[in-house]
Amino acid sequence: MQQEHKSDLHCHLNGSFSDEFLEKTAVKNGCLQVFAELMEVKEKYFQLTKQQPQEGFSLDSINLIWKQFALVHKIVRDLEDIKNGVVDVVSHSVKYLEIRTTPKEMGNGTIEQYIESFEQGLIEANQVHKNKKAVGLLSLDRTIHTVEDARRYIHYIKKSPHGVLVGLDISGNPIAKRTLSGKDLEKVIQLAFANQLPIAIHMGECDSGIERQDTDIVLAAIEQFAISEARFKQGNPLHGKVRLGHCIFLSKEQKEKIRELQAPIEVCPTCHSKLNWHLEKSVHPVTEIYNDISAPIIPGTDDAGIFGSSGKKEFAKCKSLFFNKHQLEDDDIKNHQAKFRFSNP
């Protein structure tokens, strides 16, 4: 069997389906013309983004990312597709996988039925691929969800008997108007901690006033948690409980605070390059926080089906971005990164 990287801790379901699964699903749903259009767009995108120009990719190229997502959403239409899609993602992925998805009404199904289908996909994937482990995070979209939605997700995760849902994710379009911001964002983080649920938070994805404000709120909330937990737990209380996604656009003070807290950061190298968050002739922005692979850094694919990445590729790219002062072997690095998982193997 091909050597697989141990883990992928930043994987969004809808961006990670294989072409084979999407074609099969398009046949089932009678929309092969949509799949054909998706393949045309993917090929065009691949040709345009083989190598990053010095000034970065054009806006037209970046817009092809969002076009791919729109077409995927037209193909994946019902709860059966969600369940089968989870199995597909796990079958093409690494040995330990944390998949995120934003529950939604789909077809005639309710939000709760969506979550049940997501769970069933994880259960089936773990049964089929006994050499792997897949767990799920429920994503709160900061542009549509509220504190009450967070309570609902937390309640569902806590009462679920299956043990495959392990935490929350906060994501969503960083430049759109936000429904989860300020005090409400703080409340969601506090609710997760109060219920002993891990939380992954997308952060520093754009250079705006509200993003800077919310980043300060996130860092203050996790610092308060770290202080309150320090007397009860050996080691860093944030490890295995909190991960920060991307962390590209940050102030000097925010970078210093993350470094002080030793908060884990999810780095998705291909995604960062394709969105011009990292111009490859320059150092990666996260190296201004942590510059060595022995720091709390975790590679992720983000959207493997869209960006054409894989756990193995992202691990290698991530290594190339940071120093390795201690000359750690790959297995040592992977074991180190396993500390930041939200679930035990």
Predicted regions and their residues:
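Metal-cofactor-binding active-site regions of metalloenzymes
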Residues: 1-199, 203-345
